[in-house]
């Protein structure tokens, strides 16, 4: 089985691209969805211990937690030390299940793939991109998003140009869904011929 790492900066259309891979029959691991899942369960006690007052009714309140860690690198590292081992366990289970199902390709949708060294654990990287103007408009349309929050989020991510340069495949979401579907078909055809590369 070949593993594709799907990544892209916030607002590039990565979630839509992941959904289109899933529609094409490819198993997709969604790191963000897994974070939401563990915040509602297994991570909540450890997060509350490390960041008192950030859980409500036994679940992590993401807005409260974000306010505590967004501008504090040490706090972010403490949070990542709690969450990343749990994410790795879920990720490994997903890959085992995908392999067992006989899927020729699986996609792991990880926002900070390059930033966390995840590109070494996949066979190829797909970077999702769009124009800077479209990206900002998409993000600022989200509830609760501000220019300050957006700039803080982007500061933690590699620039889009660098991600595109390092990518094996680039998917441009600027022109609607049909071009993205066509790009996905091309990627899946190319992936079938690729040697396994991951460590």
Swiss-Prot record:
The keyword Cytoplasm applies. Keywords: ATP-binding, Coenzyme A biosynthesis, Cytoplasm, Kinase, Nucleotide-binding, Transferase. One of its GO terms (biological process) is coenzyme A biosynthetic process. CDD domains: DPCK. GO terms for cellular component: cytoplasm. Coiled coil: none annotated. Pathway: Cofactor biosynthesis; coenzyme A biosynthesis; CoA from (R)-pantothenate: step 5/5. ATP binds at residues 11-16. It catalyses: 3'-dephospho-CoA + ATP = ADP + CoA + H(+). Residues 3-199 form the DPCK domain. InterPro entries: Depp_CoAkinase, P-loop_NTPase. One of its GO terms (molecular function) is dephospho-CoA kinase activity. It is an enzyme of class 2 (transferase). The keyword Cytoplasm applies. Gene3D superfamilies: P-loop containing nucleotide triphosphate hydrolases. It is found in: Cytoplasm. Its EC number is 2.7.1.24. It comes from the Bacteria. Catalyzes the phosphorylation of the 3'-hydroxyl group of dephosphocoenzyme A to form coenzyme A. Belongs to the CoaE family. PANTHER family: BIFUNCTIONAL COENZYME A SYNTHASE-RELATED (PTHR10695:SF46), DEPHOSPHO-COA KINASE-RELATED (PTHR10695). This is Dephospho-CoA kinase. It comes from Rhodopseudomonas palustris (strain BisB18). The lineage of its organism: Bacteria, Pseudomonadati, Pseudomonadota, Alphaproteobacteria, Hyphomicrobiales.
